[in-house]
Amino acid sequence: MDHLPIFCQLRDRDCLIVGGGDVAERKARLLLDAGARLTVNALAFIPQFTAWADAGMLTLVEGPFDESLLDTCWLAIAATDDDALNQRVSEAAEARRIFCNVVDAPKAASFIMPSIIDRSPLMVAVSSGGTSPVLARLLREKLESLLPLHLGQVAKYAGQLRGRVKQQFATMGERRRFWEKLFVNDRLAQSLANNDQKAITETTEQLINEPLDHRGEVVLVGAGPGDAGLLTLKGLQQIQQADVVVYDRLVSDDIMNLVRRDADRVFVGKRAGYHCVPQEEINQILLREAQKGKRVVRLKGGDPFIFGRGGEELETLCNAGIPFSVVPGITAASGCSAYSGIPLTHRDYAQSVRLITGHLKTGGELDWENLAAEKQTLVFYMGLNQAATIQQKLIEYGMPGEMPVAIVENGTAVTQRVIDGTLTQLGELAQQMNSPSLIIIGRVVGLRDKLNWFSNH
């Protein structure tokens, strides 16, 4: 280990920054956040330093480097664009046994600055030992996505509860299970963020007083249309916290690779006209796992409330008294159209968009007359097998045969394939495509040649 990671208490302690530019400003923000009594020494200062000085937040010393400013310091940072001057600052600090950071010169520094994730009082520091700051930043960004924004407030609140929790729960195991429940409780985190004292008290009392083997909960999470990068931040956090993940075939392998490693995975994939697992059985799986006290994520492709039968699953849980929540996802219409260069609405071509299921069951006739109207975009989910019928009905009710259409297969994935043509060709085009596919019909499809960015990548 080349560097010892430590967290310094700098509140009301003298610190010095030599330099008055943008880099020095970034370092100054960190020291001010830590409560340091800060002096900045430079020949000139960018406006932000002047504003801080006018607000009484720091002291500016304009002029050449003054070594005597180090005499009362606990910590120093050399942040100029003059390597020789930075070296002088480092040597002067070393002579006084003061830790000194030298920007972009780790070998000349007695300490280095890590990438920081601030969820105070929870702090996470990531460092590559100065060898690869970009790598450290990338790792920080990944960790940022895993830590809820309000986690720090929950941590502070947990400190206030420690005494009561120790009295309430006799064993270490019971206390650990309580804290695990508290730290993943979204309602408590949101209540703390909003300073909603009534909700904070109610949620806390519920968590403390309910039996530790109490029923679990189910979180309905939209996985998005395929590209793992389109999974929402909250969706990622939920699958990282799950005990059980119940997922369907539209959830990509890349997204499943993000699931917590020791979580149980239950595949309930479905295909049009054939259900690998009946919907009622899926409902019962969710109910059964939650009743065991587990945190269950029902992971669905796209958005769970758009042709995802999410409402049916939640009704079952609601009737059984199982707590649940919903994390929306990017629906296939949004993802596939964006990755195909097809805007769903456009000032000149479409003032509305309709999302329609292509499962045209007997006795469930669609309002074809309204669907055939101009100035709108139609998006058919699961419509591949009914493409010929869709073509026939729309033309029958007055839609022009030359209306542009597109079919998007495996939308947003690296294997995405798009084929376009006119409405008179729709049935024929569909025979060239495989599921999962989305059908887009409307004048906006004509913009694809100009706006198609994804195929160029």
Swiss-Prot record:
Region (Precorrin-2 dehydrogenase /sirohydrochlorin ferrochelatase): 1-204
Residue positions of the active site: D248, K270
Keyword Iron-sulfur attached: no
Keywords of the record: Cobalamin biosynthesis, Lyase, Methyltransferase, Multifunctional enzyme, NAD, Oxidoreductase, Phosphoprotein, Porphyrin biosynthesis, S-adenosyl-L-methionine, Transferase
Domain of life: Bacteria
Reaction(s) catalysed by this chain's protein: uroporphyrinogen III + 2 S-adenosyl-L-methionine = precorrin-2 + 2 S-adenosyl-L-homocysteine + H(+); precorrin-2 + NAD(+) = sirohydrochlorin + NADH + 2 H(+); siroheme + 2 H(+) = sirohydrochlorin + Fe(2+)
InterPro entries on file: 4pyrrol_Mease, 4pyrrol_Methylase_sf, 4pyrrole_Mease_sub1, 4pyrrole_Mease_sub2, CobA/CysG_C, NAD(P)-bd_dom_sf, Siro_Cobalamin_biosynth, Sirohaem_synt_dimer_dom_sf
Assigned protein family: In the N-terminal section; belongs to the precorrin-2 dehydrogenase / sirohydrochlorin ferrochelatase family. In the C-terminal section; belongs to the precorrin methyltransferase family.
Region Uroporphyrinogen-III C-methyltransferase, residue ranges: 216-457
Pathway the protein acts in: Cofactor biosynthesis; adenosylcobalamin biosynthesis; precorrin-2 from uroporphyrinogen III: step 1/1; Cofactor biosynthesis; adenosylcobalamin biosynthesis; sirohydrochlorin from precorrin-2: step 1/1; Porphyrin-containing compound metabolism; siroheme biosynthesis; precorrin-2 from uroporphyrinogen III: step 1/1; Porphyrin-containing compound metabolism; siroheme biosynthesis; siroheme from sirohydrochlorin: step 1/1
GO molecular function, one term: NAD binding
UniProt xrefs under Pfam families: CysG_dimeriser, NAD_binding_7, Sirohm_synth_M, TP_methylase
Name of this protein: Siroheme synthase
Signal sequence annotation: none
Upper taxonomic lineage: Bacteria, Pseudomonadati, Pseudomonadota, Gammaproteobacteria, Enterobacterales
Coiled coil ranges: none
Described function: Then it catalyzes the NAD-dependent ring dehydrogenation of precorrin-2 to yield sirohydrochlorin. Finally, it catalyzes the ferrochelation of sirohydrochlorin to yield siroheme.
Record-listed Phosphoserine modification sites: S128
Encoding gene per record: cysG
EC number, UniProt record: 2.1.1.107, 1.3.1.76, 4.99.1.4
Residues that coordinate or bind S-adenosyl-L-methionine: P225, G301, G302, D303, I306, T331, A332, M382, G411
Binding sites annotated in the UniProt record for NAD(+): D22, V23, L43, A44
